[in-house]
């Protein structure tokens, strides 16, 4: 199926730990993505996903006040652009993830989604 770099889209939403959940959700909706990476001084410190936002809303959290740092997954598992797509799928399934930040040479270059990986797998198998 190839590498993660062959599969992932170039779209990435970056938020800061002090951004509100509302700000993060707005950016994610504008870009049509299900996750955002949380950077602090250019360093990946977390990931915020649709699931995190749903948990906050279900808990009746005020998204205009709650901060990303309170709801993000800290120190997320990452992959490299050169990792195989099969390896990424296994990591995601084993850990219950749908989004995996992609880091190359210490720089966050994207996020690969399970949907992107499955789409690529189905195109190869057809």
Predicted features along the sequence, with ranges:
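Nucleotide phosphate-binding site architecture
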Residues: 5, 13, 22, 54-55, ...
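Bateman (tandem CBS) regulatory domains
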Residues: 2-12, 66-76
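Histidine- and aromatic-rich ligand-binding microenvironments
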Residues: 20, 52-53, 67-71, 84, ...
């Amino acid at each position: 199926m190839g590498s993660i770099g062959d599969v992932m889209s170039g779209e990435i939403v970056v938020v800061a730990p002090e951004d509100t959940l509302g700000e993060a959700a707005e950016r994610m909706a504008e870009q049509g993505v299900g996750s955002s990476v949380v950077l602090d001084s250019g360093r990946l410190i977390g990931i915020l996903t649709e699931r995190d936002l749903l948990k906050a809303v279900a808990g009746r959290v005020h998204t205009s006040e709650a901060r990303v740092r309170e709801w993000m997954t800290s120190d997320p598992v990452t992959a490299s652009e050169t990792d195989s797509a099969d390896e990424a799928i296994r990591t995601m399934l084993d850990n219950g993830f749908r989004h995996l930040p992609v880091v190359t040479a210490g720089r966050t270059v994207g996020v690969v989604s399970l949907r992107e990986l499955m789409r690529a797998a189905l195109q190869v198998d057809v």
